[in-house]
């Protein structure tokens, strides 16, 4: 059976692993998932990201990050634009997540960017998810 929403699947896997405080998680690779994983690493939500090539599509291995007392760095993930209801925003309409404490993932013509990066480059796009 094919997966109807691979981004929601990725966010659910991260959320579930984070809730039970797993050190790492693995998920099937795709170009958009690689871009999202790199943003999570760059923004400090995950420790590191590895790409493992195999005969099929490859695997993304993400190492989750936790605070000093084993508190979660990722407190919430929410899918915004879904296959049944796409959500688009212009550059000046891009949402701020928790007044800038979180990030919004935006799929643009220049790839997947955070809301801050898209605002700086003055490009809008599809609002994929909120992470805080």
From Swiss-Prot:
Keywords: Ribonucleoprotein, Ribosomal protein, RNA-binding, rRNA-binding. GO terms for molecular function: rRNA binding; structural constituent of ribosome. The keyword Cell membrane does not apply. GO terms for cellular component: ribonucleoprotein complex; ribosome. One of its GO terms (biological process) is translation. InterPro entries: Ribosomal_uS8, Ribosomal_uS8_CS, Ribosomal_uS8_sf. PROSITE patterns: RIBOSOMAL_S8. PANTHER family: 40S RIBOSOMAL PROTEIN S15A (PTHR11758). Part of the 30S ribosomal subunit. Contacts proteins S5 and S12. NCBIfam families: PRK00136.1. One of the primary rRNA binding proteins, it binds directly to 16S rRNA central domain where it helps coordinate assembly of the platform of the 30S subunit. Belongs to the universal ribosomal protein uS8 family. This is Small ribosomal subunit protein uS8. It comes from Macrococcus caseolyticus (strain JCSC5402). The lineage of its organism: Bacteria, Bacillati, Bacillota, Bacilli, Bacillales. The gene is rpsH.
């Amino acid at each position: 059976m094919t997966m109807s929403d691979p981004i929601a699947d990725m966010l659910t896997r991260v959320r579930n692993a984070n809730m039970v405080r797993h050190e790492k998680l693995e998920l099937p690779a795709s170009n958009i998932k690689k871009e999202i994983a790199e943003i999570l690493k760059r923004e400090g939500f995950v420790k590191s990201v590895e790409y493992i090539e195999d005969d099929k599509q490859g695997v993304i291995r993400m190492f989750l990050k936790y605070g000093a007392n084993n508190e979660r760095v990722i407190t919430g993930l929410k899918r915004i634009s879904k296959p049944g209801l796409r959500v688009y925003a212009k550059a000046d309409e891009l949402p701020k997540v928790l007044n800038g404490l979180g990030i919004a993932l935006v799929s643009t013509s220049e790839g997947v960017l955070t809301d801050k990066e898209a605002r700086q480059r003055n490009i809008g796009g599809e609002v994929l998810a909120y992470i805080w």
